[in-house]
Amino acid sequence: MRSFVTNNDIPVGYVTPKFPSLYWPINNSKYNTAFLYYISDIWKFSLYWTLIFNGAFYVTAGVYASLTHRKKAGSVWIFVMYVLYGGVQGLTTGTVMGFLIGAIYRSGLFSMSTWVPLCCAVVQILFDVVLSYSMVGSVM
């Protein structure tokens, strides 16, 4: 008897889905699910999504900060520092988040949809947006 989607039920011949592998199950005639079973795959997907969202957020913030300081001498360095900080933060938070949610799903013996790392990366970048406001950052 097959149990609900557990780690013990990894399909024979399972191949890790390609990177985004996001599927939309509603009104899809070719309903093709994509699940992650191994912690290394969960880590990779989490890291990629976090780097994508952090890159977009910090490049945009760096361009805006550089444009507001364009008449001063160090405006290019502002952009470089934003991008560097976004990359380092994306690498660390993506790694921690990937291994953490991978361990949680593994301990529950569940497989993970490819949407979960995307949603975790969105939550992480929204947390950065909330902390970017000075009043909220000083309260926390």
Curated annotation (Swiss-Prot):
Give me the glycosylation sites of this protein.
Answer: 27
Q: Please state where this protein is localized.
A: Membrane
- TM spans, by residue? 45-65, 76-96, 116-136
Keywords in alphabetical order, please.
Glycoprotein, Membrane, Transmembrane, Transmembrane helix
Give the UniProt entry's GO cellular component terms: endoplasmic reticulum membrane
Which InterPro entries does this one have? Transmembrane_pr_170
What GO biological process term is on the record, naming one?
Answer: cellular response to hydrostatic pressure
Q: Does the keyword section mention Membrane?
A: yes
Q: Tell me the protein's name.
A: Uncharacterized protein YPR153W
From the broadest rank down, the organism's phylogenetic lineage runs: Eukaryota, Fungi, Dikarya, Ascomycota, Saccharomycotina
